[in-house]
Amino acid sequence: MEDPLSSYKLIKDLRSGGEGKAILYEKDGVKYVGKKRLFDNLKDANQGLKEAMSLARIVHPNTVRFEDAIMTQIGDQIEITIMMEFCEMGDLLDFLIELSEPQHHHTVTLGSELSSLNLGSEYTGSDIDSTTSRTSSSSSTNFEAALLLENNNNNTIQHSHSSSSLVNGTTSPTNATTPPITTTTPNNRHSISTPTLAGTTTATTASPSSPSSPSSPSSPSSPSSPLSPQQHPVTSPQRKSSKSERKKKCSLKERKCIVKMTVDLTKKIFKKDNSNHTTAATTTTTTNTTHSSSSSSNLNIEEHVIHSNEIKKGVDSIYLIEQTQLIEWLLDLSYGVQALHRASMIHRDLKSENIFISGSNKLKIGDFGLAIQSAHHTGSIHSETVGTYCYSSPEILNSTYDKTTDIFSLGCIFYELITLKLLSHNRIYLGEDMLNDRFDSMQFLSTFPEKYEKLAPLVLSMISKNPTFRPSIESIIETLQKMDTSLLKERVVIKRENTIKGIRKQLDKSHFQEASLLLATSFVKDPRFFNIFPPSDPHSIPHLQHLYKYILKVLSSYNCSIWGYFAIDGTMVSCFVWLNPEKKKEIRLSDCIKGSLSLVTKIGLKRVGLILDLMRFDDNILSMAQNNNNNPNTSTSNLQTFKGSSSSSSSSCNHWFLAYCCTSEIFRGNGIGSHMIENVLNWADHNGVETRTVVFENNSIEFFQHHGFEVGSEFKSNLPKGVNKVMVLVRKPKQIY
């Protein structure tokens, strides 16, 4: 019988691993990767054919294309060769390793100590173990990292990260003395076992120059995990190469995938020289610098684009993937996952090592060895722990998962592409940290470059501990498609002086006229009011002002905390209204009656009737926030129609509730919102009580997430016309030391 492989011309071996090897073939001028595996019996071989079946089911531009599956008898064993598309640019992990800065090989918890790794602390290149190899495979790029680290051994590099909200947009360095924190796997092993190409393991230990360095957990990924066949030939070093040898190897390696990169300006321009001024030589060599003619003498710095093959890799990388290329890649990955899910497949091992780059720089999902059919399952699928530890969701670590676990892993890859910080190199284990209540969402958000902070809430939602709160792949695609990449182009304005000076103080009745106008102007486009006070109606703002003036009077009788911020000329530019702890959050029937009588002559009987319905709806919202029901499918019909919170226990009232907040449009982006909210948040932390609020649109979430709020509940049914959903946001009190 003719050998089925005879029609393919063998080019070279690409990689060998614990489960087999990958070989490059050519047929009719087209190159293919053959993934070879040996099995002892037919039953095991049939299991091995699952990957071929999974590949054959998916035909999509963003998944690796299946070509053929060949089964051959070799003695007592069965060999299966799966032929698939060859992606000549290699895998995404190798590409990211080439671009990313060498990191401390420390275990990291995304808590308050996260920034001690490389986000704001000083460190020297000599502290890094240059012998550590990448998890699941070895790569010659490690020699590049080791060489560059040796060249920088005597240089102290200082990094900074954003610790700002969307409101103030400032940058501050992290405390350089913060010690790194150690985490361990459930087995509490203190060394990292890295599978080599031969299937054996090598131990990675902390650098001798850093005796206090925490040890790293052992990765559950076994040497027999499915092979990533698209990678190029590499050699696992048996000894430390000399500096000259490594230099020679580095010079022979060329970057094959070339994409546009952009300068991370917020990191670049805030580097200071010894005199505490912005280093002029640094900014002018990479950006266009102009001085504004305004009185504040602002410094405007425009974005600069460079190709990835022009970048000299160093320990203080200032480059990010250019915004258009980044969004294209994020969409490539999303389209690939969408194709899987539409075919009722769960990949279960999404990671940057299993993402391949085609000749046209398109990303393709591959390695379907752990993919599983989900069409005949309802609810969660119960199985053994699978996947790769750094990218594993909390539920997959608990062996219970569904399609949403792919969303979690996809969020991890998004994080690596956006930040160029590799999870495995930084020892970041998101799923483990969430299971052990060590994950700090605020610290996670602060690791994003300010240039791409608009993407941070999306990624945070994708890695939500609760799978129910993760967005669908369709929702992710819609968000990315609607994103205007021009808004991600960076233009940094350094304010030479603070142009906003004012005072924050509590309001009394004499301020309600001005506060109500500010609220009316800010909330005229609130979806709750679309049908009552259309934004296009010139009378809507005056009518809303009457309504808010009455609301402020009522809330003041409840002893609520009403705060305003006044600019230097005495104009009120911000207003925050808080319902205090220990007070029932409800709208009383008597207030509704008084309100309808006082407003009927000002806004008309019909609108008063609609407002009464709205008050009932608002009362249900207070009940939602008070009970903090964590079932996102709960609707207002399941709550009490009126005075919904009156039956709640007194303990459920013990939280601050932000009822209204607004800042005049021309004063936004100057940190006023953060200044207004921080006093109550500090009180809440001191007293150990929660803070809650409610939002009706996704674009309102970002500000609150930057201040530690998370989505506690979401409601989508039985809502007033114009309101698509209601989200209750909850902020847990931070521990004060």
From Swiss-Prot:
Catalytic activity: L-seryl-[protein] + ATP = O-phospho-L-seryl-[protein] + ADP + H(+); L-threonyl-[protein] + ATP = O-phospho-L-threonyl-[protein] + ADP + H(+)
GO biological process per UniProt: regulation of translational initiation
UniProt EC number: 2.7.11.1
Classification via SUPFAM superfamilies: Acyl-CoA N-acyltransferases (Nat), Protein kinase-like (PK-like)
Protein name, per record: Probable serine/threonine-protein kinase DDB_G0269628
Extent of Low complexity compositional bias: 168-229
Location of region: Disordered: 155-251, 278-298
Active site annotation, chain numbering: 349 (proton acceptor)
Gene Ontology MF annotations: acyltransferase activity, transferring groups other than amino-acyl groups; ATP binding; eukaryotic translation initiation factor 2alpha kinase activity; protein serine kinase activity
